[in-house]
């Protein structure tokens, strides 16, 4: 008898076909946004779940779903998982690293460019029919080439962004990370380790690429924003909650920093209302990995984790690997 799994959000048809070769599949192809109680109801009798990062897997859910053995996230981030609770009851957690690195780095750099060059502001201005003449300072932003790029969090995506900055735009690249990169990697990235204070004070464009954790909560708040240059931009493609969005909105209004570009938000999909009223911020709905090839690769990796574990007792990218058979 095939194991039963739940696909919690709509997914590529070819991925659904692949999963149906191995499992009895209950699929949410109508893409209904289930409440926690509805998710628990849907997971009854299921051994596996294909999740997308928006389904909270916590102790309460796990207690109500005793047959669950694996949750495969179609995302590199996994702050929707209570990993300790999952491990305690023997539920494997997996994610989809690596396959989205270059695509996400592309988007991060696009957001740097759009923010520095005030693209969203000028596009709104044009659509509103307000362009009637040329001015020497009309939507004059800041240069990217030759400027200082600061990176907070220097994992795979941070390194890919560093390479683009150093080798593509001739930027001085500085970074802060929990641990220093080896000398060869630093050289390949053209990056120099600095303290967090130095990063804040020196960066012309500061991009956040660190994973969310309780220690990283509000890593950028009013005090940190006050240390940045008034001409600086802040880019967040990491996770909501790393930035204090209320403090950022205030800083943008007050001119503490010049502009921001945000792909993630605290409490998303809700966006802090003050961010919606300031002109000098570029807002996108968590789409840094959103190209068709990359999203398909992410879905395929999540599916392969489900197949690998429930059929063969193995997993490609486990987050609690102690649960996988040696």
Q: Where in the sequence are the language-model features?
A:
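Phosphate-binding beta-alpha-beta segment of Rossmann-like dinucleotide-binding domains, i.e.
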Residues: 97-148, 160-164, 168, 183, ...
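NAD(P)-binding Rossmann-fold cofactor-contacting core
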Residues: 167-186
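Hydrophobic/small residue at the entry helix of a nucleotide-binding pocket
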Residues: 157
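Rossmann-like dinucleotide-binding domain for NAD(H)/NADP(H)
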Residues: 93, 231-326
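Conserved N-terminal Rossmann-fold NAD(P)-binding element of oxidoreductases
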Residues: 150-153
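Rossmann-like adenosine-cofactor binding region
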Residues: 57-59, 180-274
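Short, well-ordered coil/turn residues at beta-beta hairpins
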Residues: 8, 51-52, 74, 111, ...
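An N-terminal-biased, well-structured beta-alpha scaffold segment characteristic
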Residues: 1-94, 221
